[in-house]
Design a protein with these regions (language model features):
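Short-chain dehydrogenase/reductase
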Residues: 1-76, 80, 84-90, 151-166
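Active-site beta-alpha turn of Rossmann-fold NAD(P)-dependent dehydrogenases/reductases
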Residues: 7, 85, 110-121, 128-132, ...
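Short, well-ordered alpha-helices that flank and scaffold nucleotide-derived cofactor binding pockets
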Residues: 18, 22, 69, 100, ...
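Hydrophobic/aromatic beta-strand patches that form the interior of the parallel beta-sheet core
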Residues: 28, 54, 82, 115-119, ...
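Short, ordered loop/turn segments at secondary-structure junctions
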Residues: 32-34, 121-122, 147-148
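Short, aromatic/basic amphipathic alpha-helical patches
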Residues: 38-46, 124-133
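Active-site loop of short-chain dehydrogenase/reductase
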Residues: 76-80, 92-123, 136-141
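C-terminal helical subdomain
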Residues: 97, 130-166
Length: 166
């Protein structure tokens, strides 16, 4: 699997990154905020797991577009996006941007579909239903999972298991 974890600085992002690395996935970890402390935190995690890393403003359309293209190119395509960024009122906008640009990289015209997982705390605003309907014809599955305050390895493995083919 070639996966992008956007919001890798969150507890859910860290747990999913570790589970993906343990499953030998090729992954890119992206901090959803461009502040220095967050960027360094994700960079340290990336070094430990042996992955790519970036830090962007996840609400900036151009930043998200460029990042998804760079990640897809570096990984040889994208199979999954794990969106874990909790940006408060800006979460829904950032999620929609991430869906739009990663779905393009997963499009069936590129020979594949893909999956987008919104792993957000309960109550975080993200209109998964509308986005799922928009991207389903492109072969992209959207899945929403509640991210607990302190996700563990079992939670992360369960999320990954939901993406496994039947």
């Amino acid at each position: 699997m070639r996966a992008l974890v956007l919001g890798a600085e969150t507890p859910a992002g860290r747990a999913l990154a570790a589970a993906l690395a343990a499953a030998s996935a090729r992954i890119a970890l992206v901090a959803a905020g461009a502040d220095t402390a967050t960027a360094f935190e994700v960079q340290r995690l990336s070094r430990r797991l042996g992955t790519l890393s970036q830090a962007i403003d996840a609400t900036n359309e151009m930043a998200v577009r460029v990042m998804t293209r760079q990640v897809a190119k570096a990984l040889g395509g994208l199979d999954a996006l794990f969106f874990c960024a909790d940006l408060g009122a800006a979460t829904a906008e950032a999620f929609a941007l991430a869906c739009r640009f990663t779905a393009r990289e997963m499009a069936p015209g590129r020979g594949r579909g893909g999956a987008i997982v919104a792993a957000l705390p309960a109550g975080a605003a993200a209109d998964v239903g509308a986005l799922a309907a928009e991207h389903a014809p492109k072969g992209v599955l959207l899945l929403a999972v509640d991210a607990p305050p302190h996700p563990d390895d079992a939670w992360a493995r369960d999320v990954l298991a939901r993406l496994a083919p039947p």
